[in-house]
């Protein structure tokens, strides 16, 4: 079975295979029209889905480990074995209804980088990172470029959240907004997902940096160090926004307390004003037979007059 052709539900499906030309650093889509134009020794980037990855012929060490990890993807991670480097990346949804979360796995073995996904998002990302490649670019660097491309627009997403929270703050200052808790909980959930995502990416970057150091790949090590620093800045920005969110919640609670204090002040004034009347009502509500006012024909009018004077 050719790696380029995988039988699936009775049809022949072409995998997307790219050749990375080491000398020029160019990335080109392989064209196989019955002729093996490219050299098999050239580094290859192969996009395929899970079923195709499972059906690949040949010896791919620890492939079952990656397949097992990809069945239930909940977080991003990377693992290095003696023969290969593999991992999964879970990219959370970022706010907009048009955006969606997606996940993919990667498997780096010899001169091949397999990118396994079901959502067909990586082809666009590869087209984007083609311009970043340079002479002598390696598959390790290609993987780094992909990871960098995944967070290119994250700062804009976080800035949008901060701007929206500023609008919420302006409303809270003027009045007590409706559905405040629902809005805050939505932003809190988004920020929690982003924080966990960046923590996982920092762990991945740290791991890859140590791996490159062990393999004496100096340029790749420096690249992963820069990536980790970039992710760390995004993580710190998320923490700053989370603190800002907490300040807005405290401001909202302060407004609630002020509003409740105003109500209690009004109730206290009303209670104080009507206290004498309440006292009179309590006295005469007991209906003791020894009260002289009950025997006096002007007693009723006298009590009314006293009440009016107190009020």
Question: For each of these PLM feature ranges, what is it?
Answer:
Residues 91-93, 172, 212, 252, ...:
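Short, well-ordered turn and helix-capping elements at secondary-structure junctions
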Residues 99-179:
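Switch/coupling subdomain of P-loop NTPase systems
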Residues 270, 274-311:
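Alpha-helical transmembrane anchor segments
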Residues 178-284:
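Membrane-associated alpha-helical segments
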Residues 1-131, 200, 204-216:
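Helix-boundary and N-terminal cytosolic regulatory elements
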Residues 36-37, 139-151, 180-188, 223-227:
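Short, charged, low-complexity loops and linkers
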